[in-house]
């Protein structure tokens, strides 16, 4: 059972983030886009944190976040956007949807460990 879901259409970014988190004590699942991410969340009730890109095919990260909150009724899952988008309007939309955090790529892995552990209750 995973406690973190990494959602990114870039296989390289998925691998980097998932490997880093796995090496630091997280149980990680991965998804290729928002649609796949929703399927993973439905299948694994242990997920506590979703780390997602914004711009992805099929379903973007913000739409996925909105569906997590509305369709799945899941307010216990924390959602952090890990993206190159540093746009105030997108951040505001994310906050209104219920996105917990916004991290702009590139990022330092060590800087996210503490907050991610706290969000997962570790």
Where would I find each of the regions flagged by the language model?
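Charged docking surfaces used in two-component/phosphorelay signaling
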Residues: 15-23
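Acidic, metal-coordinating helix/loop segments flanking the phosphotransfer/catalytic sites
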Residues: 30-49, 92
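His-Asp phosphorelay/catalytic-motif detector in bacterial-type signaling
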Residues: 46-48, 73-78
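Active-site residues of response regulator receiver
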Residues: 53, 83
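Receiver (REC) domain active-site loop signature in two-component systems and cognate sites
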Residues: 56
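C-terminal output helix
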Residues: 107-116
């Amino acid at each position: 059972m995973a406690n973190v879901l990494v959602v990114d259409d870039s296989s390289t970014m998925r691998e980097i983030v998932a490997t880093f988190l796995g090496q630091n004590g997280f149980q990680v699942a991965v998804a290729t886009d928002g649609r796949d991410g929703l399927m993973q969340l439905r299948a694994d009730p242990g997920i506590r944190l979703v780390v997602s890109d914004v711009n992805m095919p099929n379903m973007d990260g913000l739409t996925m976040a909105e569906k997590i909150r509305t369709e799945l009724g899941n307010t216990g899952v924390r959602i952090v956007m890990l993206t190159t988008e540093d746009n105030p309007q997108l951040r505001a939309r994310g906050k209104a949807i219920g996105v917990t955090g916004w991290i702009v790529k590139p990022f330092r892995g060590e800087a996210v460990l503490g907050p991610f552990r706290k969000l997962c209750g570790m």
